């Protein structure tokens, strides 16, 4: 999902998306740590998605 699509969402939806991304990031970190997965590039993608959601949430909070 790109930033333009995220800006159209409500704050509650963004919070739910953030929780989902954080859970996925944790699960992938554990898989990499236990060598069940070697998709380390996906960790970076998830980190950037989390930052993107947090940025948009902060923008919306500043506008309100």
From Swiss-Prot:
Segments crossing the lipid bilayer: none
Keywords: Ribonucleoprotein, Ribosomal protein
CC annotations in GO: cytosolic large ribosomal subunit
GO biological process: translation
An annotated Gene Ontology molecular function: structural constituent of ribosome
Cleavable signal peptide: none
Pfam families: Ribosomal_L29
Family: Belongs to the universal ribosomal protein uL29 family.
HAMAP family assigned: Ribosomal_uL29 (MF_00374)
Designated name of the protein: Large ribosomal subunit protein uL29
Gene source species: Thiobacillus denitrificans (strain ATCC 25259 / T1)
């Amino acid at each position: 999902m790109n930033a333009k699509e995220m800006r159209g969402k409500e704050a509650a939806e963004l919070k739910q998306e953030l929780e989902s991304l954080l859970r996925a990031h944790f699960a992938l970190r554990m898989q990499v740590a236990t060598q069940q997965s070697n998709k380390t590039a996906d960790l970076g993608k998830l980190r950037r998605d989390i930052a993107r959601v947090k940025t948009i949430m902060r923008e919306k909070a500043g506008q309100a």
